């Protein structure tokens, strides 16, 4: 059931942010928003979301630097972090995965499958 799933959506483009937030909320997710890498790290430490969707190009620290900070903190190290980016080249995906992202979703999002793509990245406690 997704009504208890909390997603931290990190996106600095207001149009992309609104679309992704609206789609996820319609699907029953609770969506927290951050527009910078610094804000994402701070919110994740307090809210401990179930999954973080992280744009890679952000003002201030980028998605890769924010991921490193999240992984270095025991409060946030185990939260799945999924790269959400317009970079669609294989080398970009490989770089994100090598950096430690748990997944990679391309923008623009496909509104029909986006909620299911997010669900696929949730960690379950039971096998």
Q: Positions of the model-derived regions?
A:
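Residue-level signal for the "D+5" position in two-component response regulator receiver
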Residues: 33, 58-61, 78, 90
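Charged docking surfaces used in two-component/phosphorelay signaling
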Residues: 18-26
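C-terminal output helix
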Residues: 109-118
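Conserved acidic carboxylate
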Residues: 11
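Short hydrophobic/Thr-rich beta-strand motif most characteristic of the beta2 strand and flanking loop
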Residues: 28-35, 43, 105
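Active-site residues of response regulator receiver
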Residues: 55, 85
């Amino acid at each position: 059931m997704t009504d208890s799933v909390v997603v931290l959506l990190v996106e600095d483009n207001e149009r992309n942010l609104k679309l992704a937030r609206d789609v996820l909320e319609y699907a029953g997710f609770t969506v927290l928003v951050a527009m910078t890498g610094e804000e994402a790290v701070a919110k994740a430490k307090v809210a401990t979301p179930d999954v973080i969707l992280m744009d890679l190009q952000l003002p201030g620290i980028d998605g890769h630097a924010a991921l490193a900070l999240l992984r270095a903190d025991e409060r946030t190290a185990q939260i799945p972090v999924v790269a959400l980016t317009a970079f669609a080249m294989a080398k970009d995906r490989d770089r994100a995965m090598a950096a430690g992202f748990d997944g990679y979703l391309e923008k623009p999002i496909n509104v029909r499958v986006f909620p299911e793509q997010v669900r696929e990245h949730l960690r379950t406690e039971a096998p």
